[in-house]
Amino acid sequence: MDITISSSLTPREKDKIFLLLDACYKKEPVSLTFPTEEADHYLLAWENGRLLCAAALLKEDETVYECTAFTRPDCRRNGIFGAVLEKGLSLLPEDTELLFYVDKKSPDALEAVTALGAELLSDEHMMELASDAVSAIKGMGKTGYLTVTEAMEGEQAILVFSDAHGSLNISLYGTHYYLYGFEIREGQRGQGFGTSLLIKVLSFLAEREPLPVTLQGSGSNGPAHSLYKKTGFRNTETLSRYLY
């Protein structure tokens, strides 16, 4: 088995990775994808021209890298991922920690991170409020008490909402909105101000265009997760975040 290392992928390598992903998705209907463009290091395990395992390392900060890896279903439990991981760690500073996102629909992935001794940090929930639920909130919030600012993050158009108690951001996409950066000021939490701000923002979006609203929330933040569920958001997928 040969393990190649690069900072970018060739068209041929991408094609091989897509075939590998297809084999994995057929075995387990996971939602994880492979970052073919933005990673800092790519490690590919080959045997006789056949791609057995692909891993990507993406720098999060000076001492933390996110690791995304897929191994062919018929090649698992043979030490291939372990060999790729060892090679990947040799590229990084000695005290580097790795983050793994694991779809609970993949028992093999859960088994792999457990065998590594990785620590479960949190469950990350992708949630969505359907467009009809957004429409139903129209007129419920007093949007007159809301400041709305248009801005750009790189090439992405966003709306920044704020009131006297907090703020949140909405990324604008053609088919949906993405909610992030929801903060209520210290000392004002647990008093209903988060619910009020969220309803005002959703009412504004319903007036603008009632598209689905998506977000990613941490299972470790119980109050926020409870707020989203009370407002009508539903879990669409759950990824477990592990630290190694």
Give residue ranges: language-model regions.
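Conserved acetyl-CoA-binding loop-helix of GNAT-fold acetyltransferases
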Residues: 77-90, 181-184, 190-207, 225-230
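A structural microfeature
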Residues: 51-53, 122, 164-166, 194, ...
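Conserved donor-binding loop and adjoining core beta-sheet/short helix segment
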Residues: 8-9, 29-83, 92, 166-180
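Short amphipathic alpha-helix that is part of the acyltransferase structural core
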Residues: 1-32, 119-165
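Conserved beta-strand-loop-alpha-helix junction that forms the acyl-donor binding cleft
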Residues: 99-110, 214-225, 241-244
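Conserved active-site tyrosine of GNAT-family acetyltransferases
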Residues: 109-118, 228, 233
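Residue-level recognition of the GNAT/N-acetyltransferase active site
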Residues: 68, 72-76, 103, 185, ...
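Acidic/His-leaning functional-site neighborhoods
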Residues: 155-162, 167-185, 189-190, 195
